[in-house]
Amino acid sequence: MQRRFALLFPLVLSSLVFSFHLQGQDKSADALGHPWWQHAVFYEIYPRSFMDSNNDGIGDLNGIASKLDYLQALGVDAIWIAPCFPSPQVDFGYDVSDYENIDKMYGTLADFDRLEKLGRQHGITIILDFVVNHTSDQHPWFIESRSSRDNPKRDWYIWRDGKAQNEAPNNWLSTFGGSAWQWDSKTNQYYYHFFYPQQPDLNWRNPAVSAAMYGVTTWWYKRGVAGFRLDAVDTLFEDPNLKDNPVLPGKNAYGDPNMENKYNDKLPEVHDVMKGLRQAADPYGAVLIGETWTKDVSELKDYYGTNHDELQMPMDLMLTKLKFSAQIFREHIGAVNVSGEWPTWVISNHDIVRSWNRYGDGKHNGDIAKDMAAMYLTLRGTPIMYYGEEIGMQNNDPARPEDVKDPIGRRGWPREKGRDGERTPMQWNDTPNAGFTTGIPWNPIPVTYKTYNVADELKDPNSILNWYKALLALRHKDPALLEGEYIALNQDDPNVLSYLRKTKNEAVLVAINMSDNQQKVSFDLTKEGVAMGKSNTLLTNQINLRNIATISNVTLEPFAVYIAKVE
């Protein structure tokens, strides 16, 4: 069992904040007149793993519907559901065979309609995961495309002759290992796949493809969907001349040469598609969230569009690669805010090792989980949570190659163990299978569910779950946290991340000790237009900070968080 930091310093939250309960809201705009998504809290659900309603071991839409009360009480405004469309499940749904239906393992369109309606009744809207780069090889479009060289859909995908007999058109590699070109013996050509061979890339240079895909989004908007998370947007285009990518030293987990994806990743034409998708979204007030892996803030900024006509919410996935460090986080947050755009903060998702494992030091993981929550839920911008982060769920990586379900883990073992570990079933209680199912769960549940589960944490005022609930209640309640500018404080402090969220009428101080040592800090906010008068504690996990009257000198215990209104 982890050391419960909060046993030493119990959770303190003002009664004003505790009394706040998030209610349904107008999804065209928030209370401040901004687009509804700007101040919303998003929550990613991996549908296989959230809740199983029919006890077949696989989560489903009715399972999600059964947990809307929980999500509403947590403070969630929108749920992003990973792909639930019909699929052969080669890549667990990221190989779509029909964009306008629901896979029967998850339910039916009627189940989706019920979920969407119930969600709105709970003040929660639905975001779907749109796989824009490729389809399944079982999609009717591709079945027709590969039927002959002269059929109407041949040019909907990337078909090319080889350089020579038994030689692919160029040296491009699949991100999941091996050549990115698959030979088709029926038509004697290769087709291109950035991912698995069963995931052929669409030809976005063909106007018929873009029209069809824009049409898919409209079909779902009319059904009540509030937006899309766009999968793998970087890889939509390839160099038409098929230039070889530069080869780099060394080999990857699959034994292939390392390579710079210079000619098949992040080509400028991607932004034209983002604009087209945005034009389809705007009439419905829908939001577009991008899976945007970028090397720097400048590249991330490009995805908003020069005229803010592309993605409203390109994800800052750079954050997931940073070390747990006050100084490193400060530098990155500062760079993002200097860009002038509205950030989208992500610390975990279905493709990334859980934040508990990435940021934790093996000794203070629970404390660090609270620090991370305090940071990304109080920053300027929109947060996207990942299911289970709020209870301290941990990776449960396979111990043996024969236990691996994710194909990239089977192919890349042991250097690449796959993504099974971050996709385990949600831990609802301490009964067998964590209350997820009475059947056999599709993915093993870690033994830590006996400690980290919703039912037990709801009873513990010092739990990670109640910490998240308090933070989200405060975030929804306080105008400075919703709307205020971000002002970095004490920028030379290597241990304490501190900043001000400030509007014209209000200022909130956030101070997070990211070290395992006591830290003494002082704040002079006069130059920020805040007199050194009253301070009112809003939220802390250090009991002796509850009633302090001044912030000129504050002692923060290891991993302590202090959030206060300052005047």
Question: PLM features: residue spans?
Answer:
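Acidic/aromatic-lined carbohydrate-recognition and catalytic surfaces
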Residues: 27-218, 222, 235-295, 426
